[in-house]
Curated annotation (Swiss-Prot):
It is an enzyme of class 2 (transferase). The active site is at H158 (proton acceptor). The gene is Sirt2. Pfam families: SIR2. Belongs to the sirtuin family. Class I subfamily. Keywords: Metal-binding, NAD, Transferase, Zinc. NAD-dependent protein deacetylase. May be involved in the regulation of life span. This is NAD-dependent protein deacetylase Sirt2. Residues 316-355 are annotated as: Disordered. It comes from Drosophila melanogaster (Fruit fly). NAD(+) binds at residues 55-75, 138-141, 230-232, 255-257, 292. GO terms for molecular function: histone deacetylase activity; histone deacetylase activity, NAD-dependent; metal ion binding; NAD+ binding; NAD-dependent protein lysine deacetylase activity; protein lysine deacetylase activity. It catalyses: N(6)-acetyl-L-lysyl-[protein] + NAD(+) + H2O = 2''-O-acetyl-ADP-D-ribose + nicotinamide + L-lysyl-[protein]. It comes from the Eukaryota.
Length: 355
C-alpha cells in the first residue's frame, strides 16, 4: 500500500507528504536534460540508433499548412468546399459520394510545388551519417523522399501521393499519371473499370500501411534516441510510437507547442507513456519549444554539423530547382497557347500583371 501511495503522491502529484516525495529517487539517463545539456551529451558521447517521427509542423515553412492551427490550419480553411464537417475531406464514405472537393484540395497541396525544409534535410543528414534507423511520418507531401532519403527508411504512416489505386478494381497508377489528371482538372478515372482513382493516402475508415505495424518492434529494440518533430501527438495510432522505446532511450521533442503530456492517470507507467520534460520525475525527455527549422539548426550548430547541413540544403535544393525548371520547360512546350476567350478572370489578372 505504501508503494501505491508513493506512486500517486510523487508521480501523479495527487497528494501525500513531502517526506514521501523525498523517498523517490529520479535516476536520469543523462545528467542534464536541458536542450543544451542534451546537445553536449550527443556531441561527446553520440547516439547509435535514431528513430524520427514527424508531423505537418516540419512542412509549414515550405508553405504547406498544418491541420489544426486556428485560422491558418487546413481544417480552418475548407469552407469553400462546403463540406458537412472539415474532416469529411479525408472521409472515405464522403469521398466515394463526392470526390471533387478532395481533388480540388489535392491540386493546391500536390507534391512538386514545394521544397523540403531544413528539418527534412536534418533527417537526411542523420541517414548520411549512418545514424537513422527509421523515419516515421504523418505527412502525405513526399518531401522526405525529395531530400534523397532512401525509400526503405521511410514509413509514411498516413500514406502519400507516391502511389495511387482505383477504389473499385485496385489497378495501380503512378504519381505522374495522377498529377497529370489533377492538374488538367479531370476527375481521375480508372482506365480499366472507370472507378475513381485515389492516392494512397490513409482516409478515416482505412487501415494504416502494414509496415507501420510490422517495423516498430525492430526499429525501437535498441533505439537510443527518438526525435519527435512538428506533431500534435493527438492522432492514434501514430502518437503511440512515443511509447515504444525502452526507458533508457532519450526522447527529444522539437515542436512549437508542448505536446505528449497525456494525463498520467490514464497510464500506469507514465515514464514510458507521457513526455515528462517539464516534470520533476523526468528521467529522459528533452524539449526545444519553437520552430522546427530553428530547432534542428540549433542542434546542428551545437554538434558542429551546421556547415555540413547548410551545404546539403544548398546542393540538394539546387538539384531540385534544376529538375523543376526542366519539367516546367517540358510542360511549356506541350502546353498550347491560352485562348483569350476561355481565360478566367484570374488568368487575365496574371497576364496583365506580367505585362
Amino acid at each position: 500500500m505504501d508503494k501505491v501511495r508513493r506512486f500517486f503522491a510523487n508521480t501523479l502529484h495527487l497528494g501525500g507528504s513531502s517526506d514521501a516525495k523525498e523517498e523517490v529517487k529520479v535516476e536520469k539517463v543523462i545528467p542534464d536534460l536541458s536542450f543544451d545539456g542534451f546537445a553536449e551529451h550527443w556531441r561527446v558521447h553520440g547516439f547509435r540508433k535514431i528513430v524520427t517521427m514527424v508531423g505537418a509542423g516540419i512542412s509549414t515553412s515550405a508553405g504547406i499548412p498544418d491541420f489544426r492551427s486556428p485560422g491558418s490550419g487546413l481544417y480552418s480553411n475548407l469552407k469553400k468546399y462546403e463540406l458537412p464537417h472539415p474532416t469529411a475531406i479525408f472521409d472515405l464514405d464522403y469521398f466515394e459520394k463526392n470526390p471533387a472537393p478532395f481533388f480540388a484540395l489535392a491540386k493546391e497541396l500536390y507534391p512538386g510545388s514545394f521544397i523540403p525544409t531544413p528539418a527534412h534535410y536534418f533527417i537526411r543528414l542523420l541517414n548520411d551519417k549512418g545514424l537513422l534507423q527509421r523515419h516515421y511520418t504523418q505527412n502525405i507531401d513526399t518531401l522526405d523522399r525529395l531530400t534523397g532519403l532512401p525509400e526503405d527508411k521511410i514509413i509514411e504512416a498516413h500514406g502519400s501521393f507516391h502511389t495511387n489505386h482505383c477504389i473499385k478494381c485496385r489497378k495501380e497508377y503512378d504519381m505522374d499519371w495522377m498529377k497529370a489528371e489533377i492538374f488538367a482538372d479531370r476527375l481521375p478515372k480508372c482506365q480499366k473499370c472507370q472507378g475513381v482513382v485515389k492516392p494512397d493516402i490513409v482516409f478515416f475508415g482505412e487501415n494504416l500501411p502494414k509496415r507501420f505495424y510490422s517495423s516498430p518492434e525492430e526499429d525501437f529494440q535498441d533505439c537510443d534516441l527518438l526525435i519527435i518533430m512538428g506533431t500534435s501527438l493527438e492522432v492514434q495510432p501514430f502518437a503511440s510510437l512515443v511509447w515504444r522505446p525502452g526507458p533508457r532511450c532519450i526522447r527529444l521533442l522539437i515542436n512549437r507547442d508542448a505536446v505528449g503530456q497525456a494525463s498520467c492517470v490514464l497510464f500506469m507507467d507514465p515514464n514510458t507513456r507521457s513526455l515528462l520534460f517539464d516534470k520533476p520525475n523526468n528521467t529522459r525527455d528533452v524539449a526545444f519549444l519553437g520552430d522546427c527549422d530553428a530547432g534542428v539548426m540549433a542542434l546542428a550548430k551545437a554538434l558542429g554539423w551546421d556547415q555540413e547541413l547548410q551545404q546539403l540544403i544548398t546542393s540538394e535544393r539546387k538539384k531540385l530547382s534544376g529538375s523543376q525548371n526542366s519539367e516546367e520547360l517540358q510542360q511549356g512546350k506541350e502546353k498550347p497557347q491560352s485562348d483569350p476567350d476561355k481565360m478566367t478572370s484570374g488568368d487575365r489578372d496574371k497576364k496583365d500583371a506580367s505585362l
